[in-house]
Amino acid sequence: IFRWIWRRMSDAKRIKLEGRERPVIVTHSGTFHADEALAVHLLTKLPALADAELVRTRDPAEIAKGTVVVDVGAEYSPSAHRYDHHQRGFFETFDAEHKTKLSSAGLVWKHFGKDILAAHMQCADSDERIPTLYRKMYDDFVEAIDGHDNGIPLYPGISDPPAYRSRTDLSSRISFMNPRWNETWDDAD
């Protein structure tokens, strides 16, 4: 029965502090990128990691001490909370419908996104809104970070449709500040 319960627990509920007073999130040192910056930010939205210490290193001994490790260590192992995407043979995608290879941000969202939403919305992770928001957040935000970090062009060929949505560019940000076509607005604004 324990295995049955364990398999049904979310990844966020499996985080163990292993005698530590404070959890540790580890990522690589040096130049930072959007994928691990987002991955770390998302992880700190989980109650178990809200006050986590951030360690930036490439030292294997320090990496091994991490409660959760993202974007470093050449290991993808959800059961050990290791979320790197740089190793050979890694081709994990969000689900069967998506083709974009996940970055550390996508891996964190895939494994913790529903728990992050539930914590943010202060609702049960079984709330009926969670699956829709989980998918929408990936499609409209996280996937573009995955694509960019993995060097996947938005337009693979001249006549190809976009490989993923990119709604975080400057034009999109400005567009989001304008009223929608069906909203009333005052031209003086």
Q: What does each model-found stretch correspond to?
A:
Residues 182-189:
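Hydrophobic helix-and-loop "lid/oligomerization" segment in the mid-to-C-terminal part
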